[in-house]
From Swiss-Prot:
Function in brief: Involved in the binding of tRNA to the ribosomes.
One GO cellular component, as annotated: small ribosomal subunit
A biological-process GO annotation: translation
Name recorded for this polypeptide: Small ribosomal subunit protein uS10
Assembly and oligomerization: Part of the 30S ribosomal subunit.
Keywords recorded for this protein, A-Z: Ribonucleoprotein, Ribosomal protein
Protein source organism: Nanoarchaeum equitans (strain Kin4-M)
Statement: the UniProt record of this protein carries the keyword Ribosomal protein: yes
Gene Ontology MF: a single term: structural constituent of ribosome
Record flagged with keyword Ribonucleoprotein: yes
Family, as annotated: Belongs to the universal ribosomal protein uS10 family.
One Pfam family this sequence matches: Ribosomal_S10
Length: 109
């Protein structure tokens, strides 16, 4: 049975969890099978910046980092569920969240 794979990325964990809960609510409302949310490892991007060059050639570095939280949700395909997901304002226009949808045909949920 084909299914829809939703990958969600965000730097804000609370916003990510809110979107995941909204997706779970829509799926529960329509009654289709769902697997997930599966938390993926957090990606940490580090940027070292030379703050000052100290006395006698010593260097002082600052390190800035950004954490990217990721989740995967698999949903059995249903026209009604997909329409509800696409029309939900929380899903369609997030500011800090990126969402990827992928239709997979040959795998069982």
């Amino acid at each position: 049975m084909p299914f829809l794979r939703i990958k969600i990325y965000s730097t804000d964990l609370e916003e990510l969890n809110r979107v995941v809960e909204k997706i779970k609510e829509i799926v529960k409302q329509t009654g289709v099978k769902m697997r997930g949310p599966i938390p993926l490892p957090t990606k940490i991007l580090r940027v070292p910046v030379l703050r000052i060059t100290g006395h006698r050639g010593t260097k002082i570095w600052d390190t800035y980092q950004m954490r990217i939280h990721r989740r995967i949700i698999d949903i059995a395909t249903d026209d009604r569920t997909i329409k509800l997901l696409m029309r939900t304002p929380l899903i369609t226009k997030p500011e800090k969240i990126q969402i990827q949808l992928k239709y997979i045909k040959d795998k069982n949920l």
